[in-house]
């Protein structure tokens, strides 16, 4: 259980989750494949392939491949969240606020995002001479989406607008998002980013006998972790395959989603 909780706590985004799953597979002697090369697979060996640093397929081939079938399990690496837009901030000069410019991602329970310590993590692309670099980042800064005081919401209704009521506070109006971003990628030119909010509260066991897990991102990291763990520990009698796709929360129709090739 501790290993699972540790996995959840350091899997801030789909990109971090795939990196952590890859480390598990590497420790179990799975061999990495790439899609731009032909594969020479051997009976009794284990392999994995990653696409777009956010999806992974791992499989085991039994020693005997005569009349074998497939055992397949699938899950997804992404979780409901808020995604940072390309124009990263909204400056409210009148109230001296800098808000992170976000949009909803996936099927979230909106009220669970209020009044919690929120982090920003994901990947950032920079231009370096003649190449593009990908950086996996996790901001030290903590944000918050504040709720409204009760005397300002007498109606009792709760129907927040994500683009108005749920932009997280990032600092005062002089806060520079670009300057903070450069803390994590250096002075190289930032050309793009895939950044998401996540709940900084760590997973923990709760209940009289610690029989329950309290955590964000259980949808669907619980299945991602347990399916990869099961594959690693299995004694393959068939071709056993585990697929962890991205973008399930938004329809799976991406080049690294379940509706891809």
Q: Can you say where each PLM-predicted feature lies in the sequence?
A:
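N-terminal hydrophobic/helix-forming segments and targeting peptides
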Residues: 1-261
